[in-house]
Amino acid sequence: MKHKLTIMFLLVAFSIAAYAQKSTTLLYGPNDNGRTYTSLEEALTEPQNVYRLKLTKLPARDSLPAELFLLTELRELTVKGCKLWTLNAQIDKLQHLQYLNLDKNKLVRLPESIGNLSELHFLIVSRNLLETFPESIAKLKQLVSIDAWNNPLYVLPESISILNNTLQTLDLRQIPLTKSEYEAMKELLPNTNILFTDICECENRREHD
């Protein structure tokens, strides 16, 4: 019995290790070497072979440089801490995007065209200035997670209820929601795990803002 348990343990351990290895070496195409580019200039030297781009520094500007939208094979795009005020409407040229991270910018709205990113699974817009999402967010049928903590986001578009059975997590922590605001969101997304800051603390904080 002890011998059988040992074998079972080894099989489970091997399966977990194999899955972890597969997850960390996920490739998006035959020319994908797993590289994450950190320079737009370098990525543009071979635009059809760029699947991951992470930018944390951009020259002072309000929106993304137009050349970025030549990277039509992108699956993962991170533009973090670049002080962007606007997300270009051309974002829908990146039709294969599965992961979009716009953390720590100054975005006040998202364009309606974001709803055309039909393959998007993860949307990160934390630490911006968003007050709501565009109605077109309901078109993102493969979206499983929205990270929007620390935005002045108190209202969700009614259309988002279409994602009730697919959107697993909506992170709204560090947003001073009142009880009625939270309940309205939960009514739209009863099957979604909505993460939020303690409502009582939020109400107190907004009274003093």
Go through each PLM region and give its residues.
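Bacterial Sec-dependent N-terminal signal peptides
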Residues: 1-27, 38
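LRR N-terminal entry segment and analogous cap-like coil->beta motifs
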Residues: 27-89, 94-98
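The feature encodes a structural signal of leucine-rich repeats
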Residues: 41, 64-66, 87-90, 110-113, ...
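Leucine-rich repeat
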Residues: 47-48, 69-74, 92-97, 115-120, ...
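Conserved hydrophobic beta-strand positions in leucine-rich repeat
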Residues: 51-56, 77-79, 97-102, 120-125, ...
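Surface-exposed, polar helix/loop patches in the mature regions of secreted/periplasmic/lumenal proteins
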Residues: 93-144, 154
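Leucine-rich solenoid repeat scaffolds
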Residues: 154-209
